[in-house]
Amino acid sequence: MIETVALAVVAMVAVFFVALGAASLVVPARASRFLLGFADSPYKHYAELATRFLVGGAFLLTAPRASWPGAFSVFGWVLVATTAGLLLVPWRWHHRFARWAVPEALRLLPLVGASSLVLGGLVLWALFRGPDGGPGA
């Protein structure tokens, strides 16, 4: 049961990456507003951390069933570890960093969009291809 939920979470994250990539390329102003909204309140900060932790755990649980278990494990552990680090940082510091970093990233929005599309597609492919080249689910 938990593996099925983890698989669904990772699939939803992949679809999110595809949607973010498409929005970044087709409606960049809307994508920019969305990205600028992160970490601007304590609630959003902790919601982001909870989401990152959940997604990291889902990648770790899904890794054995994916085409690239090593990549899924590394990505999952990176999310879990950086989330733990962000838990130690006051949300105002995270907010200050986001106010600086997001506008810098938005200068490269077409690249962010294309990368997001590719990442989402690769995650979906790795999920549904599975570790032995067959369906992963």
PLM region spans:
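Transmembrane alpha-helical segments of integral membrane proteins
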Residues: 84-98
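Membrane-helix exit/interface motif
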Residues: 23, 29-30, 54-66, 89-93, ...
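Membrane-interface helix-loop junction between the first two transmembrane segments
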Residues: 22-40
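A loop-to-helix transmembrane entry motif
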Residues: 9-12, 39-52
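Short alpha-helical packing/oligomerization segments
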Residues: 66-88
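Hydrophobic transmembrane alpha-helical segments in integral membrane proteins
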Residues: 1-17
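Juxtamembrane boundary at the C-terminal end of a transmembrane helix
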Residues: 123-137
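Core segments of transmembrane alpha-helices
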Residues: 48-59, 112-120
